[in-house]
């Protein structure tokens, strides 16, 4: 079966650096990690969450006071995997700036909003989508009832996280997330998901001054 993500990863370019000991080759993502840049791309799932959390913890150990930049292009995915990344972002000492490129949907939008205050950015043509969690269950009626109760608790917790980071009331968040709600970059800024919309590095650097 064709997997576009795996195919793309097999085509990752290499960067060659000259050192005092000769040449050293890095894949492009490892080289960017040296610059404290993390890419969160594709569906959010357990394997990806482990890699993102490991990178966050490593960069904190390198310099706990220096900013980490996380670039997000994700349709969302597994709630527990996304919350593992979220909790790690909040746990570490290093501030994490978030940048949306392409799309941040579902858990992707929550992680975008979870960046350090004043350091949440969207590129101008990015799309952001928020909604309530969904799930399907099979089995005995009592088991289905327990799963339903758990997903309602999860929904409340996710709503509380959006309230915390977006400055909206719980009622506003619940109403907006009731169905798939798509936003432009400017609409996401107005809603409180991001702090800035920049179309160039110069604009971002000028805004940071």
UniProtKB/Swiss-Prot annotation:
Entry keyword set: Cytoplasm, Hydrolase, Protease, Serine protease
SUPFAM superfamilies linked: ClpP/crotonase
MF-aspect GO terms: ATP-dependent peptidase activity; ATPase binding; serine-type endopeptidase activity
UniProt-reported outcome of changing residue 106 to A: No longer rescues a chromosomal deletion of clpP
Family: Belongs to the peptidase S14 family.
Lineage per the UniProt record: Bacteria, Pseudomonadati, Pseudomonadota, Alphaproteobacteria, Caulobacterales
Biological role stated in the UniProt entry: Cleaves peptides in various proteins in a process that requires ATP hydrolysis. Has a chymotrypsin-like activity. Plays a major role in the degradation of misfolded proteins. Required for degradation of response regulator CtrA, thus contributing to the G1-to-S transition. Required to degrade DNA replication inhibitor toxin SocB, this function is probably the reason why the protease is essential in this organism.
Subcellular location: Cytoplasm
Organism: Caulobacter vibrioides (strain NA1000 / CB15N)
Underlying gene: clpP
Signal peptide: none
One Pfam family cited in the UniProt record for this chain: CLP_protease
Protein known as: ATP-dependent Clp protease proteolytic subunit
GO terms for biological process, alphabetical: protein quality control for misfolded or incompletely synthesized proteins
CDD domains: S14_ClpP_2
Coiled-coil zones: none
Subunit structure, interactors included: Fourteen ClpP subunits assemble into 2 heptameric rings which stack back to back to give a disk-like structure with a central cavity, resembling the structure of eukaryotic proteasomes.
Main location: cytoplasm
Reaction catalysed by this enzyme: Hydrolysis of proteins to small peptides in the presence of ATP and magnesium. alpha-casein is the usual test substrate. In the absence of ATP, only oligopeptides shorter than five residues are hydrolyzed (such as succinyl-Leu-Tyr-|-NHMec, and Leu-Tyr-Leu-|-Tyr-Trp, in which cleavage of the -Tyr-|-Leu- and -Tyr-|-Trp bonds also occurs)
Keyword Hydrolase applies: yes
Residues annotated as catalytic: 106, 131
This protein's record includes keyword Cytoplasm: yes
């Amino acid at each position: 079966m064709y997997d576009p993500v795996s195919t793309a990863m097999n085509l990752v370019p290499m960067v060659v650096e000259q050192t005092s000991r000769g040449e050293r080759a890095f894949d492009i993502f490892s080289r960017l990690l040296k610059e404290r840049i993390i890419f969160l791309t594709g569906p959010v799932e357990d394997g990806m969450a482990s890699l993102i959390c490991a990178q966050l913890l490593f960069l904190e150990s390198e310099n706990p006071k220096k900013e980490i930049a996380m670039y997000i292009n994700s349709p969302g995915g597994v709630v527990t995997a996304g919350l593992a990344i979220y909790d790690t972002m909040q746990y570490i000492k290093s501030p994490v700036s978030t940048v949306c490129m392409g799309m941040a949907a579902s858990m992707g939008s929550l992680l975008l909003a979870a960046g350090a205050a004043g350091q949440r950015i969207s590129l101008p043509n990015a799309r952001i989508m928020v909604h309530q969690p969904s799930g399907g269950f099979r089995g005995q009626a009592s088991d289905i009832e327990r799963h339903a109760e758990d997903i309602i608790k999860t929904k409340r917790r996710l709503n509380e996280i959006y309230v915390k980071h977006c400055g909206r009331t719980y009622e506003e968040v619940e109403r907006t997330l009731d169905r798939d709600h798509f936003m432009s970059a400017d609409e996401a800024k107005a809603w409180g998901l991001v702090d800035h919309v920049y179309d160039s590095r110069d604009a971002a650097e000028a805004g940071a001054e």
